Structure formats: C-alpha cells, structure tokens
Amino acid sequence: MQKSPLPLRIFLAVLLFVCLPLAALARTPPSLGTISVSELPQEARVTLRLIQSGGPYRHRQDDSVFGNRERILPVKPRGYYHEYTVETPGAKNRGARRIIAGDKPPREFFYTDDHYQSFRRIKE
C-alpha cells in the first residue's frame, strides 16, 4: 500500500481543522431577539391572552403542533411547540403572524411576523 505524500496529508489535515468548526457553526441556530408584551401588536396581545386562557381559537390550525423544521427555535421534542394565529387586519387568509407556545401548559412564547423566518422571545 502506497503512503500519501506528506504535502497531501498536511493539506487534508488543515482542511479538516478548518471545515469542522464551520460545519458546526452552520448548524447553530441564530440567536433570538426579544419583544415585550407591550411592544406586540394589539392582535398578538389578544392571541396571547387566548392561549393563556385555553381558547377558544378562531382557526382550526390553532393549537396544532409546530414542528420547528426551520430549527430557529431551541430544539425540543416533537409536540413541545404549538402554533397560534395572530390576526392580520385586511388579510384574506391567516396571514404571516404567529405566536409559538412552548410546553403544556405554555411556559415560553415566541412571536413571528414573517411566517417563521425569524422569531422573538416574548418577555412578560
């Protein structure tokens, strides 16, 4: 069996040490900003109160499991997150705004106004 030339082995070792940390960074979820309840749009505050009181909800998709496929929120077991519609005035559909609640009963809340592209943790 022929050994690899030394320069090739050095190149591969350097490549390995450079690429592994970059790959780990690519999988690290972005940091979440925060938003206070008072900064939320009025419709989001109404939705938050509905969640905290257990409904009733206007849309059949509300209180359904949110899969966190985007991996922007902290990774938790399936079923941990549930999604709720935040009404958007003038929208003919559910719009892009949601509150995601974590745990049952909910203990943490996240707001998105761009249909899961970004989230902010709601601080009470």
Predicted segments — roles?
Residues 26-74:
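N-terminal secretory signal peptides
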Residues 11, 23, 29, 99-100, ...:
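Small/flexible residues
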Residues 55-124:
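Functional cores of ribonucleases/endoribonucleases
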Residues 5, 9-21:
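Bacterial N-terminal signal peptides
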